[in-house]
Amino acid sequence: MKNYILFSFLVLIGFGASAQKFAYVDTEYILKHMPEYKSSLSQIDGMSQQYQKQIDESFVEVDKMYKAYQADQVLLTDDMRKRRENDIIEKEKKAKEMQRLKFGPDGELFQMRTKLLKPIQEKIATAVSEIAKGKFIDFVFDKSSESTMMIYASTSYDLSNDVIIKLGYKPETTIK
């Protein structure tokens, strides 16, 4: 009976002592190896510049209207003045609305960014998951995430190169 209790105690200690395995990846490092990421960023940047140009042109037009109004203000009747003021205000509202529609939290640029980058993120997540399952790893942290603070991590726990290889790229070559 004593042996049975001792054996049970040792078995329970053994289960409690089985440590969980941790690893980490550096998604910024992984993304630098993916040509589709660079291509997506180029598309997003191009669209951003195009939108910004349209918005800048709208605000330049508002500025021109305002300067013309200031120059003509003395010569205008009250009705004409109010009409021009309303035109300027309306044009400025439209420019601000365009800015919100293009760059706002639910704007076209945000939607485009999500559409282009989500498949890349899912591809990385799938590769990380497969590698972690294959190596019996319980938790994988992202070293490049601002919410994960890693003061020290041994490179032996870094799965980044494994992920790059799993995705079909070479770890020693980055996309420029």
Regions found by a protein language model. Give the residues of each.
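Sec-dependent N-terminal signal peptides
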Residues: 4-15
